[in-house]
Regions:
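P-loop NTPase motor domains
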Residues: 2, 20-21, 33-39, 45-63, ...
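Post-Walker A helix-loop "phosphate-sensing" segment adjacent to the P-loop in P-loop NTPases
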Residues: 154, 467-477, 496
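H-loop/switch region of ABC-family ATPase nucleotide-binding domains
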Residues: 480, 717
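Extended, folded cores of ATP/NTP-driven motor/assembly subunits in large transport
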Residues: 1-410
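The start of beta-strands in P-loop NTPase/AAA+ ATPase cores
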Residues: 29, 120, 475, 641, ...
């Protein structure tokens, strides 16, 4: 009869106190730590060498026995979905709620079918340092493990890895659940699993049950393990599992840095266990002395032309090298590697095993199963820093600690920042990428720049990101100086406000308007500042001087004075003076008075004599001429959370003025509340940078000051050479801690590399063409974006839901298909 055994018996865990795992048979105290990886493959050769060297140094601080465990798991996006559900419940716009639901469905699908996350753990046991004391207290053990953990943490932080573990019992339980219960953890996230176990005990023992009263193995022991079918595999919770090892004589003779990553990067359904055992140097020296003596004696009796003589000389040289290395303070180590391969069926598991074995043969390595030792291999794979001696002996390879640096395993890179928005999938590993550019602990500022030539997917990437930021509750402002209509569908679909500024358009923003600001949040932070606040009118007139310098760029000092006097008189005609209280309309419950328009200023300039004549004449076009739509009161609403200002219908001559009006209005709104996130996005920024010097200066100002108002400035641009050659372009890049680079031609890639530090591999990928030819037409595949944030570089495949794609695509084929579908629906409706 087949035996199905509860794996509670396999755990050998007595308890978990704080974050210390206490095992039995034998009794051991083990600390488990988790570390984030780095994007090692995209580092330059010199950076890789430095990391390997640093890891070699780090190994000297490691305990005598160290277990490194790497697991591949489906990406857990439950916390991001939970946050999005919360935002959805608070959302007032029904259109936005529908978009949030679409994104949640996509995230659920991604986590089940595509997303893979690599997690990296280190476990090590408490070891006595000698002496007569054999019964240390738990506090002494915990203190020793804590110090060792801090030493490992500091050493790995020097390599670029940060710790992800928390010194708590619940974290340790969740980590063990992920490491041991692969099938369960894929079907039931930790939060749900924890709640189910606790509720089960509450039903049986009452409401006073807490985490400490429940046997710890209930949280991380699989439901069952069945090893009776075959000596070559076992079944754990319905998952087929085979444990394998790298034979001692099958390791690479010359290893490149990070070679250990080939095991968990080639196939998703694997985990890797790597043990490092430092041997006693005195014992090794005694053994070496004996072996060297015997080999020297043997060498005297062997002919120098014999093959045996060469082998013996090599052995002697290796022995002397080890002896000298130990004398220099290096550690003599034995390492061993075990690979666990999972499958949803027997055939699936065997196919993956054969695929991995053939892959390793091509790497001049070998892979063998732990035949007849599946239960022992299961116990060895538990992250308790232990191992089966027989399996270890089959796989062990001696190596000096200084050479172990090439085994550096923390080489994947995941980017799942708490509170971030989903951008897409990590191109290298398939894991989802969540970016929170507002995280001040990671980023000096929240600004972003998106670079790419025409047709590379800049606007697609920008709109995808902005829609998701809006779904997170962030206020979005977009200025579109080119093809603003591309934003219209997405804006309206999420319940936004689409504003077109152009001659003949009914919508208008009055540049003369002094807008009342909501200072409630600032007053809570700074106290009521009414008494110290400067004159609002003076600040407004200063802004208007900048605006009129666009209309009259060569204005003389006399004309500036005439303009200033005319502005003061114009506002005075409406009862507005330098006193801020004069702005209040006594008949409208604290609202501001009616504001002048350009036509009112035009009249004052007409009365200013010859010195005001030139400004008067140039302003006439905006009052009674073809651009008279600028001479209207404001009739748009900026209270919406997604606002697009389309200035693309303006001529090159009028564009700087339209841009100034739009950004002036948006900045007024953005500066009101320093506690709420907001984004000012400028698409096709090169258009504004070229429009005029003042336009470029204003854009730079936005990028510099927005951080102080809990904001982010996001720019998307082509014509990279011109922008980067411009002093203002360089200032914007310096004030943007995050850059997104899309595929570009050689010339543009080289221009970017001059201001952004890229490796040769990154340059190759950027210059790679993304065009495919089909049926005589060119179609661009989904863009792969290189995100450069601080020292981290990662290629991301932008992923949009079907709903999002239909709203933001600019592909003629996609739009034609949408038009056909809409026409068909209309015909069916009629």
């Amino acid at each position: 009869m087949k035996q199905i055994t509860s794996t509670q018996e396999f755990m050998n865990v007595l308890d978990i106190r704080d974050d210390i795992i206490i095992t039995q048979n034998p009794t051991q105290y083990v600390k488990l730590m988790e570390f984030s990886p780095i994007n090692f493959e995209l580092r330059s050769p010199s950076e890789q060498d430095a990391i390997i060297s640093q890891f070699s140094s780090a190994l000297r601080t490691f305990p005598r026995n160290t277990h490194i465990k790497i697991i591949n798991t489906p990406s857990d996006v439950s916390s991001f979905i939970k946050d999005l559900r919360k935002k959805q419940a608070e959302e007032e716009q029904p259109e936005c709620r529908a978009m949030q639901e679409s994104q949640i469905e996509m995230l659920q699908k991604v986590s089940k079918t595509q997303g893979v996350t690599r997690r990296f753990f280190i476990s090590f046991p408490y070891e006595t340092s000698g002496g007569f004391r054999t019964s240390p207290t738990f506090n002494e053990i915990q203190s020793t493990l804590f110090k060792q953990g801090r030493s490992i943490q500091a050493a790995l932080e020097a390599c670029g890895n940060s710790t992800l573990s928390y010194e708590s019992k619940e974290y340790t339980l969740s980590a063990l659940y992920a490491c041991i219960c692969k099938a369960q953890s894929e079907a039931e996230p930790w939060d749900q699993h924890l709640s189910r176990i606790v509720e089960k005990y509450k039903e049986k023992f009452g409401e006073d049950v807490n985490l400490d009263r429940i046997p710890v193995t209930d949280f991380f022991a699989p439901e069952q393990i069945d090893s009776s079918y075959s000596p070559n595999y076992t079944i754990i919770d319905g998952k087929y599992v085979t444990y394998c090892y790298i034979p001692s004589n099958a390791y690479p003779t010359q290893a490149v840095g990070g070679w250990l990553s080939i095991f968990f990067s080639y196939i998703d359904d694997v985990s890797v266990d790597f043990w490092i055992k430092k041997e006693d140097p005195e014992m090794i020296q005694r053994r070496l002395q004996f072996e060297l003596k015997n080999n020297r004696i043997k060498s005297r009796n062997i002919d120098e032309v014999s093959l045996d003589y060469d082998d013996l000389m090599n052995t002697l040289d290796a022995g002397y090298y080890i002896k000298q290395s130990i004398a220099n303070g290096d550690d003599y180590c034995n390492m061993a590697t075990m690979i666990t391969i999972y499958g949803n069926s027997l055939d699936d598991m065997n196919d993956k095993f054969n695929e991995m074995r053939e892959f390793l043969i091509r790497q001049d390595m070998a892979l063998k199963r732990c035949t007849l030792q599946m239960d022992e291999a299961f116990r060895s794979a538990l992250p308790f820093a232990g191992y089966n001696k027989k399996i270890f002996a089959k796989s062990k390879r001696n190596v000096m600690a200084s050479q172990l640096g090439s085994c550096y395993p923390f080489t994947a890179y995941e980017l799942c920042e708490k509170g971030g928005v989903f951008l897409g999938l990590n191109e290298a590993y398939g894991s989802p990428v969540f970016v929170n550019n507002f995280d001040t602990a990671r980023y000096q500022n929240a600004n972003m720049m998106i670079f790419g030539p025409s047709g590379s997917g800049k606007t697609y990437t920008l709109m995808c990101m902005l829609l998701r930021m809006r779904q997170q509750g962030t206020q979005i402002f977009v200025v579109a100086p080119l093809k603003g209509f591309e934003f219209k569908r997405a804006c309206e679909a999420i319940g936004g406000e689409f504003i077109q500024i152009a001659p003949g358009q009914p919508q208008n923003i009055n540049i003369m308007e002094i807008r009342k600001k909501d200072t409630a949040a600032s007053d809570l932070i700074d106290g009521n500042t009414d008494s110290t606040r400067g004159s609002v009118l003076v600040a407004k007139i200063q802004q208007l001087h900048r605006f009129f310098s666009i209309i009259v760029p060569d204005m003389t000092a006399t004309e500036k004075q005439v303009l200033d006097d005319a502005l003061v008189r114009t506002y005075g005609n409406f009862g507005i003076t330098h006193r801020n209280k004069s702005l209040i309309d006594p008949n409208k419950n604290g609202e501001y008075k009616k504001m002048p328009v350009l036509g009112d200023l035009h009249k004052e300039l007409n009365n200013a004599g010859d010195d005001g004549k030139r400004i008067y004449n140039l302003l006439t076009r905006f009052v009674t001429g073809s651009a008279r739509s600028f001479n209207q009161p404001t009739n748009v609403n900026l209270d919406n959370k997604f606002i697009v200002v389309d200035v693309s219908q303006l001529t090159d001559e009028l564009l700087p003025m339209g841009m100034f009006i739009a950004l002036d209005y948006i900045l007024d709104k953005a500066e009101q509340d320093r506690t709420k996130r907001k984004v000012i996005a400028i698409d096709e920024m090169w258009k504004l940078m070229k429009a005029s010097q003042l336009s470029a200066e204003f854009v730079v100002e936005v990028f510099k000051i927005i951080r102080g108002y809990a904001g982010s400035a996001v720019g998307a641009t082509q014509d990279l050479g011109d922008v980067l050659a411009n002093e203002y372009g360089a200032a914007i890049i310096n004030n943007s801690k995050t850059k997104l680079l899309l595929p570009m031609d050689k010339k543009e890639a080289e221009a970017v590399s001059k201001v952004i530090d890229l490796t040769s591999e990154e340059m190759k990928k950027l210059k790679r063409t993304e065009m495919t030819v089909a049926a005589g037409t060119q179609k661009r595949r989904a863009s792969n974006v290189l995100m450069v944030a601080n020292t981290n570089h990662i290629f991301i495949k932008i992923k949009a839901s079907k709903t999002e794609h239909d709203l933001i695509t600019t592909s003629a084929d996609d739009l034609a298909a949408q038009a056909r579908r809409n026409a068909q629906l209309a015909a069916e409706h009629n």
